[in-house]
Amino acid sequence: AEHPDVRPETAEFLTLLREQTERLAQMTKTLLEMSNLRQVARNERIQLAPMIEEIFTDLAPLSDKLGVTLTAEGDGIMTGSDALIYRLIFNLTENAVKYNQPGGSVRVSVTQELEKLLLRVSDTGCGIPEEYQRSIFQPFFRVDKSRSREYGGAGLGLSLVWEIADLHGGSVWVEKSSEKGTTIAVELPTQQSAKP
C-alpha cells in the first residue's frame, strides 16, 4: 500500500487529496497557457502527419491500457504555432481515447484544400447528446462527470482546442455524433494573416 502506517479510510482520503491537488495544478497550468495564447508566435511551418504520429506515440500508454486502436490518414502543411497545433490535436485525440469503449478505435484524418485544412478526429465512443454539442467547448464543462473524475483533467481540454483554433483563424465543431461514435472537425487556414 502507498500509506502502510495509516488506516484505510485515511489512506483513501490522502489519495483523493493528492489527486485533487494534481488536478488543481493542471488547471492552473492550463489557465495560464490560455491567458498567454495571444503572445505565441504563429509563423512556423507545420507538417501534420509526422506530428500526428508523434502524438500517437505519446498517447500509446493510454490507448494500450484502454485497448483503443489509433489510425491516421492524410497529411497537410500549414503555418502556425507548432506547440499549439500539437496541443489541439493531442487534446482531441486524448479525449477520443478516454471517452471511447474498450477495444474501440480513434481515427485522425487530414484533408488539405487550397487555403485550408480540415482535421477530423473520430471515435467509437457512446456519443455526445445533441444538447451538449456546443457546450463541450466551454471551460469546465463535462458531459460525464463520473468519467472525468476517473481520468482526471480540469475540464479545459476542449476549451483550449477551441481557443487555439480561433487564434489561428479556424473553427471547431461536432460534425456528427451518435451512440456509435463522434467526429469532431477542425478547419484551419493554411496561412496566418498578418494581424497579431
Feature map (PLM): residue ranges:
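Short alpha-helical segment of the dimerization/phosphotransfer core of two-component systems
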Residues: 16-24
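Short conserved segments within the C-terminal catalytic ATPase subdomain
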Residues: 62-72
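Short helix-loop "hinge" at the ATP-lid/N-box region of the Bergerat-fold HATPase_c
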Residues: 96-97
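Short beta-strand/loop element within the Bergerat-fold HATPase_c
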Residues: 103-115
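Acidic ATP/Mg2+-coordinating residue in the GHKL
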Residues: 123
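Short conserved segment of the HATPase_c
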Residues: 128-142
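Conserved glycine-rich
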Residues: 169-170
